[in-house]
């Protein structure tokens, strides 16, 4: 019993455990004093029964308990403090430790083993660990001591020493096998001892310091994770900044190399210094052209034909927000959809050296080739006739005008190229050809009425945009079926702005050079050169008549008075409107498969558009709304009977223009056109027999009509 006082001294030993945490192994040495305390712990053994349920393998613990003392250190997490006490017994490697091992062999001996619990310090572990499992934790107090070793042991935790703990020396290392110590708690059932020594509760505080060491390990792991996340975020940010910087520098470099669009002509915006840049650029192109032919020499061409100095029929379609061409030297940012320049090398490579196999069509303007850019995008490359003043004017008009506009029903220019005398325009390729091809091409299936109406509405909207939404307004001057491209969904795209004119808001433009296509020209423009947006309206009316009747604008088989579609249709339009008998004018190929209300709207629009006096014609936005059914066809008449130019109640003709004068001018046009017999005698193609042409004196005496030759199956030229 005298030993009892020593237990009292045991509290002092707890301090020793404190230093032990740093040196994990030293801990076993300090425990020697505690052995005396072992007996006191014996009384509490019975209560520990609660702990045993936690661990099913009691038998193994019995053997292990003696040795676990050291092992408990790993268990700190487990809270089976009972074993820890035993560790102290092993620590006194003196003879006592051997004695303790024997008792562990029998589970019943736990009471004997309880002496090991004397380590009141064991309670210390409870504090380090979670209070919720107090029962087990008390037994684990010793583990707290061991926690300090864990840092070193972590490397070996996998070692199965738990069973070997029988040797006291091993205990320090045994910490890794905390799993084994857990069973000991049952055997010792020493869990009660911790409660028995409440005073030890204070000592646990010291062990608590050791457990603290384990949390740092976890926190360090958390910190390492956080650091990794932070590094990843920081790295991503730095990468984004670097990419942005590279993009900015590249863009800046491109701008330096930019070429301004060609010099303006007839009010087309853009500066004139482009010519110097163009010549310098062409020099570079000559040196870099991979194909055998350099830009200075024209690419291979088909045989020549008579030139008309007119706009061709071709232009490609450009869908909404379409993909831009791949970056190229001199890439420039322009207005609208227009994006920039191409070099001759790119276009030569895209068209396979401007090979004849890639030729889509040819006309007075030059040639059109199909090409494919490096990004796989199909394009149509229009090569304007070299050395032609008309070709240069068309080039300036297209670059200056098309680059300013963007509408889903207007063809947009993708880019252009200037190389020496070469002038090339690049459009997105449209594989479904033109309205003329589908309406008049030989062997073509009959176009359904729904498709015809859809094309009429789309092209009307495109023209309305040019007339109403562009400032200043743009007059196309060459509206015809072959200049309306369609995609596979039969959406219309108005093309070919080579003859387009920027109109003045105040004065009617009077041209000394009448240009357009025979059969589509407005009478006032053909006879006097007076050009307004209503000239486009007349031409569009002719296109509507083609959609309704399926006829061409000029009947080549009738060289007499009524060979014009307009002259034939005008008298019938009034009859159709009064009687509602559309069979007189409707295309027989439709077999009456059409909506009568929609047909009535289109007939009314066509009649209003082809009125002989320009002021009596409707605006294109009105035409588009009537075709869509948004307003009544009667809104187009304004007191005018369809097919006539006179106002109701008026005894005379229109005061704006003399219809007889217009008719006389048109008769002159017919005479000149029909005198050019080769226009009709030579087979140009199975469609598009009516080319654009021009008159140089404002009348028709000097005009020439020539054919735009097109390859079969293609709607370009």
From Swiss-Prot:
Coarse class of the protein's main subcellular location: membrane
Q: Broadest EC class?
A: transferase
Here the segments flagged for biased composition (Polar residues) are 632-644, 692-705
Chain residue ranges for the region called Disordered: 1-221, 258-323, 632-665, 690-717
Catalytic residues per the record? 478
This protein's superkingdom? Answer: Eukaryota
Instruction: Summarize where ATP binds, as residue positions.
Output: 360-368, 382
Domain (Protein kinase) spans 354-631
Provide the reaction this enzyme catalyses: L-seryl-[protein] + ATP = O-phospho-L-seryl-[protein] + ADP + H(+); L-threonyl-[protein] + ATP = O-phospho-L-threonyl-[protein] + ADP + H(+)
List, alphabetically, the GO terms of the cellular component aspect: plasma membrane
This protein is called: Proline-rich receptor-like protein kinase PERK2
Supply the source organism for this entry.
Answer: Arabidopsis thaliana (Mouse-ear cress)
- Tell me the lineage of the source organism: Eukaryota, Viridiplantae, Streptophyta, Embryophyta, Tracheophyta
The encoding gene is PERK2
């Amino acid at each position: 019993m005298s030993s009892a006082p020593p237990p009292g001294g045991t509290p002092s030993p707890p301090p020793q455990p404190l230093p032990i945490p740093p040196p994990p192994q030293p801990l076993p040495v300090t425990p020697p004093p505690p052995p005396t305390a072992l007996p006191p712990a014996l009384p509490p053994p019975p209560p520990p029964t609660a702990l045993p349920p936690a661990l099913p393998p009691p038998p193994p613990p019995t053997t292990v308990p003696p040795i676990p003392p050291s092992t408990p250190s790993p268990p700190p997490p487990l809270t089976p403090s009972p074993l820890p006490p035993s560790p102290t017994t092993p620590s006194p490697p003196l003879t006592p430790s051997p004695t303790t091992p024997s008792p562990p062999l029998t589970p019943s001996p736990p009471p004997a083993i309880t002496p090991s619990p004397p380590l009141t310090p064991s309670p210390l572990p409870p504090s380090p660990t979670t209070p919720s499992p107090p029962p087990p934790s008390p037994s684990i107090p010793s583990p707290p001591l061991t926690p300090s070793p864990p840092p070193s042991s972590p490397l070996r935790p996998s070692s199965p020493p738990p069973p070997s703990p029988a040797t006291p020396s091993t205990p320090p290392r045994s910490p890794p096998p905390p799993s084994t110590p857990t069973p000991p708690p049952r055997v010792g059932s020493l869990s009660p001892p911790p409660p028995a020594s409440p005073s030890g509760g204070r000592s646990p505080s010291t062990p608590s310091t050791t457990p603290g060491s384990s949390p740092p390990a976890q926190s360090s792991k958390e910190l390492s994770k956080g650091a990794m996340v932070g590094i990843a975020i920081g790295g991503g940010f730095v990468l984004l900044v670097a990419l942005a910087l590279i993009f900015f520098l590249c863009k800046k470099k491109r701008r330096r190399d930019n070429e301004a669009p060609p010099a303006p002509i007839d009010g087309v915006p853009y500066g004139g210094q482009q010519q110097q840049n163009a010549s310098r650029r062409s020099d570079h192109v000559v040196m870099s052209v991979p194909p055998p032919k350099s830009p200075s020499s024209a690419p291979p061409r088909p045989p020549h034909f008579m030139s008309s100095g007119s706009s061709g029929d071709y232009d490609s379609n450009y869908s909404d927000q379409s993909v831009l061409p791949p970056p190229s030297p001199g890439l420039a940012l322009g207005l609208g959809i227009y994006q920039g320049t191409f070099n001759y090398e790119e276009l030569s490579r895209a068209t396979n050296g401007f090979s004849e196999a890639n030729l889509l069509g040819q006309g007075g303007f030059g040639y059109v080739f199909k090409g494919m850019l490096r990004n796989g995008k199909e394009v149509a490359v229009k090569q304007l006739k070299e050395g032609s003043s008309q070709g240069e004017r068309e080039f300036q008009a297209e670059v200056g005008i098309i680059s300013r506009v963007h509408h889903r029903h207007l063809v947009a220019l993708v880019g252009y190229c200037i190389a020496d005398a070469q002038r090339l325009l690049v459009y997105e390729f449209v594989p479904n050809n033109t309205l003329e091809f589908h309406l008049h091409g030989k062997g073509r299936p009959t176009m359904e009425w729904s498709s015809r109406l859809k094309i009429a509405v789309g092209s009307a909207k495109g023209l309305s945009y040019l007339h109403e939404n562009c400032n200043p307004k743009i007059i196309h001057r060459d509206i015809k079926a072959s200049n309306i491209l369609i995609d596979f969904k039969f959406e219309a795209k108005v093309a070919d702005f080579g003859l387009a004119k920027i109109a003045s808001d105040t004065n009617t433009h009077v041209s000394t050079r009448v240009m357009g296509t025979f059969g589509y020209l407005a009478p006032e423009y053909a006879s006097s050169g007076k050009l307004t947006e209503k000239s486009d309206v007349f031409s569009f009316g002719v296109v509507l008549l083609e959609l309704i009747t399926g006829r061409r604008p000029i009947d080549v088989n009738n060289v007499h008075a009524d060979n014009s579609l307009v002259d034939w249709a005008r008298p019938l339009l009034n009859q159709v409107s009064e009687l509602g008998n559309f069979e007189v004018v409707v295309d027989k190929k439709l077999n009456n498969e059409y909506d009568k209300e929609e047909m009535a709207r289109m007939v009314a629009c066509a009649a209003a558009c082809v009125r002989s006096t320009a002021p009596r014609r409707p605006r294109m936005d009105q035409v588009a709304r009537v075709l869509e059914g948004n307003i009544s066809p009667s809104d187009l008449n304004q007191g005018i009977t369809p097919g006539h130019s006179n106002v109701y109640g008026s005894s005379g003709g229109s005061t704006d223009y003399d219809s007889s004068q217009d008719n006389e001018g048109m008769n002159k046009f017919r005479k000149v056109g029909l005198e050019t017999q080769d226009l009709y005698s030579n087979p140009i193609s199975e469609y598009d027999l009516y080319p654009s042409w021009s008159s140089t004196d404002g009348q028709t005496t000097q005009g020439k009509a020539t054919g735009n030759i097109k390859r079969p199956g293609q709607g370009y030229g």
